[in-house]
Design a protein with these regions (language model features):
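Transmembrane alpha-helices and adjacent helix-loop boundaries
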Residues: 1-189
Length: 189
């Protein structure tokens, strides 16, 4: 009963964790356009079909982020004792209520450090979207460098931009982690 969904999830995770992000981006952007063009041509439509670069980047990075995050959530699930489900059942909670009110808050607390690392990787991977002509920080930096011939200045500014985003993200995740662990502070003392 669970074999098919498990096989699909394992295949999805293996494929998108195994492919380089740039290759995934190029396959989604160019491959989907070519596939859609062929399907539409078979249906008699001879016009051009273009995928928006932002949409292609969003889909590609969502697939990669989902694949890596699925492993983090799986590990979080494996750390929860089986007694948690039993306790929810003993309290008369439905599976849905038990999951959302009891288990998910614990899972989120466990998964947050890994998810924050994934977020930082995703943040850095956004520099790859310049390869499909989506205007981003790196594309603007490369344009400025080609016009002014001052690579160190503009790449330094890009560095500061990415470091600023990473630092702000780190602060947000640190706050969320502190907030999700606040009930444990008294137990540690």
């Amino acid at each position: 009963r669970k074999r098919l969904p498990r096989a699909w999830a394992t295949t999805f995770s293996t494929v998108f964790r195994g492919l380089p992000e740039l290759l995934t981006l190029l396959i989604i952007y160019y491959g989907c356009q070519i596939a859609a063009q062929k399907v539409l041509a078979a249906l008699g439509y001879e016009g051009e079909f273009l995928i928006n670069t932002f949409v292609a980047a969003m889909i590609a990075f969502s697939l990669v982020f989902a694949a890596f995050s699925s492993e983090i959530w799986l590990a979080a699930f494996k750390t929860l004792p089986k007694g948690q489900w039993e306790a929810c059942s003993a309290l008369g909670l439905s599976k849905r209520t038990g999951f959302f009110k009891v288990l998910l808050p614990q899972l989120t607390r466990i998964a947050l450090p890994g998810l924050s690392n994934n977020w930082l990787s995703l943040l850095k991977d956004t520099s790859l979207v310049s390869t499909i002509s989506l205007v981003d920080l790196m594309r603007q930096t490369n344009l400025a460098v080609s016009v002014t011939k001052e690579p160190m200045f503009f790449y330094g500014v890009a560095c500061l931009g990415y470091l600023l985003f990473a630092a702000l993200s780190g602060r947000v995740f640190a706050y969320i982690e502190r907030r999700s662990n606040r009930h444990l502070q008294g137990a540690r003392a």
